[in-house]
């Protein structure tokens, strides 16, 4: 009886394809709601476009267009100027899950599993019942190949519904068009616009255009023409390798001896290190790796831990860099202060990684709300599961009050700030297949903590400086109200002209004094002398701008001249130690008394206005 039941059960047992599995478990890949399904689709297509362009050395120019095709349906069109895809590969790239080129590559990349874009194709055919349209071209002399595809979920193979050649204006690139059940939302952090804005910040070399369903066009311009440093593929590192993985490597290696196997299968193992590992494991360097079993593999794992092996190389990573993080934040935010920090590469379980942080503060950011945390992994925004991410946990564990931000009740601080956190690695440890959050790996959390504290210290310094400038400003307002009245009264008593009070104000405030004196000569020319005196206690480096509608003669020292239409901007670079003075002089021809009295204000670039008396001032970048 029991045998009969077992036989009956056996009849119902069969294997399923990976496509069938994801068909029934689409939420695993981020297709669990209408708004999120659209964001996931755009994310996967944009990731592919950026990766393809970077691998080909092409500055990315990406178009994302969303059209409403029904009450609950949208059509998504994503187009790029990448290298294109050869004809034979198009069906498999878009309509076969777990098909890709990066799964076994140990280097930083946005996508690895070969699931993303084909999962979007699967979701589109499940919810709208329509095929996905692909157009791709590999060069100006080559035809554009057009496909209409669906996925056969029983076999995880592409069903080709249409295959033809078409004309396309682009010299090279790829376009994908999908119709699906989804919702386009605006005005919140988890939206297409915010996702693309975040993508533009950490990919400042890309130009991204969004055309919304209402026809509104939003362009995220590139901030640099410099391509990211390409990530180089590396061999596995012995640290953190698992027993089963090592046994598989031993079984399938082409090497016939253990020592060469170690040298050429792992990074940072040379001849001497390989011999040390063999000695520590008690294994003969000449033994055939294929003859080693589980017991010997375990000995090798133990030897890896005993022998000092150099950390893996970091050229497999492509960090954004502090300068480009600054440019990205500056381009997409309107703030008063930006600080950045890039940590040195570190290692977890043999995987190199690097942490980068940017902090933007002030401007029109809300003061009474929690700061905005922008999370990224390998230059890809993470929009969901913020509370379950190591980046958020690191932010919450910092005592922000000592850096100038309120933290009522602990957790994420409150204030007008955006905190950008980027983790780049050959293997980012996500908490799930949907890649929404990074796992709590202690060494990664430590690096995030150190990077955040670095920018937080810079923020503290900035806020302290702003507080001091505010006090100076308030003091100067009082002085400039009182001194003129005193000067007028004293001048009346002594029956003399009212003196210039700027030198007195500068001396009391400890400011930089800039004073221009013009003397008319009998021949119609005029001599101009600009005196600069530093009454402060610090050395200053700055520029003095004199903007005039005429050329000058005999300038000492010689300024840099910038033509501005019919006017000229004369610029002197000056360094002034505490208590020192500088003199600038020049002559102008044929001026009337009226013209001499209408000189524009001198401008000091490089110092806050609170530190300068007698001229306009701006800090600059």
Swiss-Prot record:
Keywords: ATP-binding, DNA-binding, Isomerase, Nucleotide-binding, Topoisomerase. The keyword DNA-binding applies. One of its GO terms (biological process) is DNA topological change. Its EC number is 5.6.2.2. It comes from the Archaea. Homodimer. Heterotetramer of two Top6A and two Top6B chains. This is Type 2 DNA topoisomerase 6 subunit B. The gene is top6B.
């Amino acid at each position: 009886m029991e045998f009969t039941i077992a036989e009956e059960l056996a009849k119902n047992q069969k294997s399923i394809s990976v496509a069938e599995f994801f068909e029934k478990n689409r939420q695993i890949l981020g297709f669990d709601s209408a708004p999120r399904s659209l964001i996931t689709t755009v994310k996967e297509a944009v990731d592919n476009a950026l990766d393809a362009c970077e691998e080909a050395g092409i500055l990315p120019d990406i178009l994302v267009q969303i059209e409403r095709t029904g009450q609950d349906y949208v059509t998504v069109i994503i187009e790029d100027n990448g290298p294109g895809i050869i004809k034979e590969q198009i069906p498999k790239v878009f309509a076969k899950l777990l098909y890709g080129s990066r799964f076994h590559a140990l280097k930083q990349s946005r996508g690895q599993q070969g699931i993303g874009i084909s999962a979007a194709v699967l979701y589109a055919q499940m919810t709208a019942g329509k095929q996905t349209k692909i157009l791709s071209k590999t060069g100006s002399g080559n035809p554009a190949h057009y496909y209409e595809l669906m996925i056969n979920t029983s076999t995880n193979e592409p069903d080709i519904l249409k295959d033809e050649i078409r004309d396309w204006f682009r010299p090279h690139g790829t376009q994908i068009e999908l119709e699906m059940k989804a919702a386009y939302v605006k005005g919140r952090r988890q939206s297409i616009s915010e996702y693309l804005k975040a993508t533009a910040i950490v990919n400042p070399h890309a130009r991204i255009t969004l055309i919304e369903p209402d026809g509104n066009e939003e362009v995220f311009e590139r901030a640099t023409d410099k391509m990211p440093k390409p990530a180089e593929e590396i061999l596995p590192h012995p640290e953190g390798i698992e027993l089963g993985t090592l046994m598989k490597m031993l079984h399938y290696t082409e090497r016939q001896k253990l020592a060469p196997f170690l040298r050429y299968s792992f990074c940072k193992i040379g001849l001497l290190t390989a011999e040390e590992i063999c000695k520590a494991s008690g294994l003969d360097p000449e033994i055939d790796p294929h003859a080693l079993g589980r017991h010997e593999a375990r000995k090798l794992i133990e030897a890896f831990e005993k022998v000092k092996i150099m950390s893996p190389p970091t050229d497999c990573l492509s960090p954004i860099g502090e300068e480009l993080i600054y440019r990205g934040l500056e381009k997409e935010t309107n703030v008063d202060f930006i600080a950045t920090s890039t940590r040195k590469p570190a290692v977890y379980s043999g995987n190199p990684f690097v942490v980068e942080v940017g902090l933007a503060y002030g401007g029109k950011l809300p003061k009474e709300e929690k700061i905005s945390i922008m999370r990224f992994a390998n230059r890809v925004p993470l929009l969901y599961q913020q509370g379950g991410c190591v980046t958020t946990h690191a932010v919450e564990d910092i005592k922000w009050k000592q850096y100038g931000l309120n933290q009522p009740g602990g957790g994420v601080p409150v204030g007008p700030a955006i905190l950008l956190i980027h983790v780049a690695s050959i293997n980012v440890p996500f908490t799930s297949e949907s890649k929404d959050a990074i796992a709590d790996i202690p060494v990664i959390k430590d690096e995030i903590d150190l990077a955040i504290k670095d920018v937080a210290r810079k923020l503290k310094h900035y806020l302290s400086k702003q507080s001091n400038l505010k006090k100076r400003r308030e003091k100067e307002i009082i002085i400039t109200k009182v001194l003129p009245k005193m000067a007028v009264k004293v001048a009346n008593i002594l029956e003399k002209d009212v003196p210039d009070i700027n030198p007195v104000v500068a001396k009391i405030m400890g400011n930089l004094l800039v004073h221009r004196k013009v003397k008319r000569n009998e021949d119609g020319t005029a001599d101009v002398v600009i005196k600069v005196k530093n009454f402060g206690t610090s050395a200053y480096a700055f520029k003095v701008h004199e903007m005039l509608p005429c050329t000058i003669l005999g300038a000492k020292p010689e300024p840099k001249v910038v033509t501005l239409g019919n006017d000229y901007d004369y610029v002197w670079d000056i360094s002034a130690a505490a208590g020192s003075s500088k003199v600038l002089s020049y002559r102008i021809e044929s001026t009337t008394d009226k013209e001499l009295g209408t000189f524009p204000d001198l401008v000091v670039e490089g110092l806050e206005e609170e530190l300068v008396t007698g001229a306009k001032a701006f800090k600059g970048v």
